């Protein structure tokens, strides 16, 4: 536990130091840009190239009350197909380190299964309504059997959201079925993520979101709700968003943590 606390302390200190060394307030000439970027970041299919680097620290995981750290690298790349449509690629590359989760004294570290989502979304926004649909793919890239399902998976992916002044709210859903792979357990799982974000005119934002997964094969439901504060900053010539907040878990999944902390750094590449 001492090592876990030390790890969190170092991570928080790094983020605070990074924020202080960054330009903690955008200049007047950047206010409009910062506000616009904060709003675009709340929209999963915005025409904005970004690279979120998401750190998750989860505590009291499962019956052995273990610890799990997940680093999710999530590049988002929008591609203009024609005058009316965008295609947005969203990839989640998880790097996981956990202890006392599968057995007392156990330690596993490695790559998890990569998830690749594609959204096709109309460029024209009518009445503030934004939507996108496409496929989601699960790739069996885990380097340890306990860090992934070792299954190929595929399914539908969709989102809908409303842009209303400083607010953005909506939901993302998908469903994955496995169809091949060496893993012992088939996948039949639904994911649902409602969210609401308020973006201020200075580039700061507050998001309330929940991430829920229903495992139909095992009749397990698990998820968490979190509230996150974030701020658009500049570091030299690089624009980024820095943020984080607490998470509280719920559901009947026996490997749910009790609580956690999320810290994000998102590199921004506006056109």
Predicted stretch roles:
Residues 24-271:
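Transmembrane beta-barrel domains of Gram-negative outer membranes and organellar outer membranes
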Residues 1-8:
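Bacterial N-terminal signal peptides that target proteins for export
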Residues 8-17:
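Bacterial N-terminal signal peptides
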């Amino acid at each position: 536990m001492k090592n876990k606390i030390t790890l969190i302390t170092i991570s928080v200190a790094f983020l605070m130091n990074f924020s202080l060394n960054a330009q903690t307030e955008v200049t007047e000439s950047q206010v409009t840009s910062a506000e616009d970027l904060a709003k675009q970041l709340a929209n999963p299919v915005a025409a904005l190239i970004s690279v979120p680097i998401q750190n998750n620290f989860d505590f009291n995981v499962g019956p052995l009350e273990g610890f799990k750290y997940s680093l999710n690298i999530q590049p988002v790349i929008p591609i203009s197909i024609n005058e009316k449509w965008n295609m947005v690629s969203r990839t989640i590359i998880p790097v996981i380190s956990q202890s006392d989760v599968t057995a007392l004294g156990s330690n596993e570290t490695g790559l998890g299964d990569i998830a690749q989502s594609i959204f096709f979304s109309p460029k024209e926004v009518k009445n503030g309504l934004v939507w996108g649909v496409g496929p989601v793919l699960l790739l069996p890239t885990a380097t340890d059997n306990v860090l992934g399902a070792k299954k190929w998976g595929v399914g539908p992916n969709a989102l809908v959201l409303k842009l209303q002044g400083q607010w953005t709210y909506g939901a993302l859903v998908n469903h994955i079925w496995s169809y091949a792979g060496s893993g012992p357990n088939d996948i039949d799982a639904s994911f649902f993520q409602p969210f609401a974000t308020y973006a201020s005119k200075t580039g700061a934002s507050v998001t309330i979101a929940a991430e829920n997964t229903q495992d139909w094969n095992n009749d397990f439901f698990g998820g968490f709700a979190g509230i996150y504060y974030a701020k658009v900053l500049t570091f030299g010539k690089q624009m980024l968003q820095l943020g984080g907040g607490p998470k509280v878990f719920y559901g009947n999944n026996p490997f749910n943590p009790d609580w956690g902390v999320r810290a994000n750094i998102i590199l921004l590449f506006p056109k």
